[in-house]
Amino acid sequence: GAYLSRHERIDHVHITGSERTFDAIVWGSGDDAVRRKAADEPLLTKPITAELGGVSPVIVVPGPWTEADLAFQAEHVATMRLQNAGHNCVAGQVVVVSRDWPQREAFLGHLRRAMASAPSREVWYPGSSDRLSAVRAAHPDAAWSDGGRRAVIEIDAGDHDLEVVEQFAPVLGVVLLPGTGQAFVDAAVDYANEHLIGTLGANVLIDPVEQTRLADGFEHTLERLRYGTIAVNAWTAIGFLTPALPWGAYPGGTLSDAPSGIGVVHNALLLDRLDRAVVRGPFRPFPRSLLSLRPNSRGRCSLLPTPPWFVTARTGASVSAGLTRYRAGGGLRALIPTLWRAFRA
């Protein structure tokens, strides 16, 4: 890596990794790196862009959820944490829930069960087992499952390592904030902006009734979220999978302070001076999503009973393979068997 990044025929460096790796490339290592950083004398003298992950929030806006809504969205959040065993740069890590939501405990119960019942996965990424062991030692009474390889941990706002250290492992923090409605949304955005490290991706779950009630107030609050990709009723990884959208940290990273990186990739439309991308999805799966077709509803319709990327999807592997073949050049006729398998998820 050092040889390639400093080679005379390399004009620009881009990496995906950790802030530690970024610092090693830009400033070097050891005491010399400390001196260089203090003097603003980078070892790397060519432009660099980077995507470095971070701690991604999942903001759960309180509303009149049905029992089916609670179960589905709990699986949604579990997917954000457990997909690829938690080894994702934009895995959900801190769930922000209203302390005053009447359905708070029901939702958290569904979330613990969803985390515990998802298919077992090995924690394989280098260093993740060590971080998991450290969390287990610090929180032996948390809701552990999968043989001690997963946890749901209630933490105090503004005072926990889960807020400032990307775990890259199946550990999910839960923070309770006061308020409901617009007051809660404002408080949750302030908390995410001020206390969670990184600006790569933020997820927001809100039912159509509450979104319609909050109207433009909700949209204006989204504008204050300092994240490169915001997903409303979706996972920010969908933004990563959409080539037309930019993917990277919220603008403002520097060589000396880039917790989620500098610059963007993808952006197939080559748009300039972008702050963020916003991805929107359906709050409910098919057929319950058909309720979103009512007049004046801000909800979105879905034709999928279970999205194929959910960790609970029974046909996720075959559907993902079929969609990949379709995007690589397959025709609509070849897509039909894949859609049929998706309906059976």
State the predicted function of each range.
Residues 1, 17, 53-54, 86, ...:
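Glycine-centered flexibility sites
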Residues 1-2, 189:
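Short hydrophobic/charged patches on amphipathic alpha-helices used for structural packing
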Residues 6-12, 19-160, 182, 232, ...:
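ALDH superfamily catalytic-core signature
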Residues 9, 75-79, 96, 103-117, ...:
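Conserved C-terminal structural/oligomerization subdomain of aldehyde/semialdehyde dehydrogenase
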